[in-house]
Structure formats: C-alpha cells, structure tokens
C-alpha cells in the first residue's frame, strides 16, 4: 500500500490521506476523543433531532427515556467502531474491504458519501440560520459563509478538526449550562414531565431517532482515532468516544424535547430563533447564535473530511493506490461541500420534515454494514489485517466478497416490511401499531448471518497485522 511522504506531520495541513499511519506519526490522547465527540453532538441538529420525538407525537417523559436507551445502544455500536482506529491506523471505510472486497466495499461507501452530503446539508441550514441572525444577513448568505469556514478547516485536516473540537466542547458546555438554567428557571418543567401518554410506537420512534443518530457516526468514527498510538487501550477508546458522543447527544436532545413541548407548532421552520429565544435576548442571544454556529463547525467538518476519505477510497480501489494527491484531496473536499451547500440552499424552507425522513431512512442502509464490520473485526480478524492487500484487487481480499454483499443486501431487505418513514412505509408497520422495529432487525439478522457464514468460510486471515514495509514497499 503506497503512502505519502511524511512531510511535516506536526504542521497546519495534514499530509496523510487514506494510507496507514505509521507509529512514528501517532499522537494524541483519549481526552481529545472525548472532547471531539462531545462537541460533535452538543449542537443544534441534535437539539432538533430530540425535538422530533415530541413533534411526531411523543410525550416529554417517555421521549427522554426512549432517547437515552437509543443513545446507549447506538453509542455502543458507534464506539466499537471507534476503538478500531488506534489498532489499525486506517480510515474506517477502507477497512470494509476486508469484509466486502476491494471493489465490493464501494457499495456501502457510496451510500456513506450520500450520508455525509445529507448531514452536511441539513446541518448547514441550521448553522446558516445562526450565522444569519448573528450577522444580520439572510439565511442564504449565512449558509455560504458557513460553507467557506468548513472548506478551510477540512483542508487543514485531522489536527485542526481536533483543535476546533476542544474549543467547541468548552463553548458548548457553557452555552448548554446557561440555556438549561434559563429553561428551568422560566418554565414549569414539572408540568411537562407529568403529562404522560405512553405509546409503544412513539417510544420506539424516539429510540430510533437517537440510535440512528449514533450509528450514523459509525462509518467515520475511526477516521478520528486512527492517529492515536497503537498502545492505546481499546476499552479506553471505546469509553472516551462513546461517552463523549452519548453525553453530548443526550444533553442536546433533552433540550430539544423541552423546547418542542413548549413551542408546539411554532417550532418548525424557526428552530434556531426559538431555541435562542428560550435562553435570552440582546447581547447574550448574539453569543448563543455564535455558539450554535460554532457548534456546527466540528460535525460539518467531520462530514466533509469523512467524505474526502470515502471518495478517495472509491477512486483508489479502482486505481490500486493507497493514497491520493493533495490536489485530489482539495477537489474532493470542495466538490462535496459545494453539493451539500446547494442542497442546503434549495431545501432550507422545508428542513424539519425532510430531515426526519432522511435520518430514519438512512438507518436502514448502515445498520447491516455496521453489524458485518463489527462481527468480522471482534469475532474473527481483530487487528490482523493485511494492509498492502487492501489496495490489491488480486490480493488476499479479492475484488468482491459475494457472501458479505449478499448478507448486506439481506440486511436491508429484511428491514423494509417494518420500516416507517416519510420516504417509505413497510406493509407490516400498521399491523404493529405504527411501530418501527426495522433498525433492530438490521443489526441482529446480518450479525447472525455473517457470523455463521464467516465461520464456515475458507478465507485467509493473517496471523498478525501486516504493514506496507513488510511487503517491500516504500518506507512511509
């Protein structure tokens, strides 16, 4: 697997791309993982996602419990992916070639790219609203200004994103503490919690919202832990990533639940203004608008950076290369942000409805991939990967792994009868009282099928991690 020259590994702009990170370039600690994922989740889109639990018919009390359960389940799945990063030193999706084949991995990777674009677009709408309020411009100008910041940060890469994550985590904590204090001081929260009307459909819908939120990070979470020293504890990485993500998302979604319950029908299309209005007016409101915009910087940069990784993985699979040029990197990043910005500009007036459909439908495509990847890594291969073979269609992992691809497709199909979104509603949803259990099947069925299939296969698993240098390739 070819690699970039190291260059100035401590410089402002990252040199590495999808290639293996050698031990000499590993750095960072678990605290940076916690702050990165805390800041990535403690933001406006998570608030809106929590609000959907109430907007779509749930009460406050049971919505809070369901969201927490979904966070814990989805967060565990997401953190298991994150723990792979230090051991492999590779981006998340390129490691999917072990399960799907060098060409076969492009099937889930293409869908991952769509995910990045969708999340970036929806996040840009909310960040654009905050920038517009802060600078007294229209929403379109706010979206464009926000996109320009994301381009710069993403081009700088890994170190810059982690640095901004640390700053954003501090700003986010201060902002949320203030907004919660204002919320509890000025509103009767007890009355909201006392108004209970449990329905299984609403409860599982709320679980689906938070579980899908967490699982959707799975395809790129290891991208941001791959520079950690290989000696980093896998359990420590699991908890640093998982706790940061779950705590940040749950705090934001709890606030969203209360905000939507207080706002009623006035929440839709005015999400940012209403949330800030709960906190304060005047100069303090301006600071809250800034915190909202800055809070979106981290996660949108993650999306753009992950998109670059995924696009580079697709192209390198056909070219048999393990790295991409700096020019290609810039083109991938700029292209992705342009597309997501255009979507944000064209869809900003119907954001809430479209985002609901997007995030729930998205889950059907990523739970099977996640199940296959995790079962393969933790039950069979661990960190025993042949890194050079990841770029060789004629190597150990081949072009296509028919078994994994078939199980992935089955994992999607088995969910369809039970899937309930604005995009598609399965035929068995009404029989279950409107309850959506598709994501549970999407995790369990592919996991069981892949475990059985992999145990019976004759594929070759190396005895240890094989690095590029051991195949006589250029010294990284």
Predicted region positions:
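Loop-to-transmembrane helix boundary motifs in multi-pass membrane proteins
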Residues: 314-349, 396-415
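Transmembrane alpha-helical segments of multi-pass small-molecule transport proteins
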Residues: 109-113, 134-156, 170-181, 210-221, ...
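Hydrophobic, membrane-embedded alpha-helices of multi-pass small-molecule transporters
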Residues: 28-47, 180-186, 196-259, 282-304, ...
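Membrane-interface "cap" regions at the ends of multi-pass membrane proteins
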Residues: 1-60, 202-208, 226-236, 457-476
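Helix-loop-helix connectors at the membrane interface of multi-pass transporters/channels
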Residues: 93-97, 124-141, 229, 303-334, ...
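C-terminal membrane-solvent junction of multi-pass transporters and transport-like membrane proteins
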Residues: 369-448, 463-465
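Hydrophobic alpha-helical segments and their helix-loop junctions in multi-pass secondary transporters
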Residues: 137, 170-196, 210-215, 254-262, ...
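Transmembrane helix-loop boundary segments of multi-pass membrane transporters
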Residues: 54-65, 129-143, 159-168, 273-280, ...
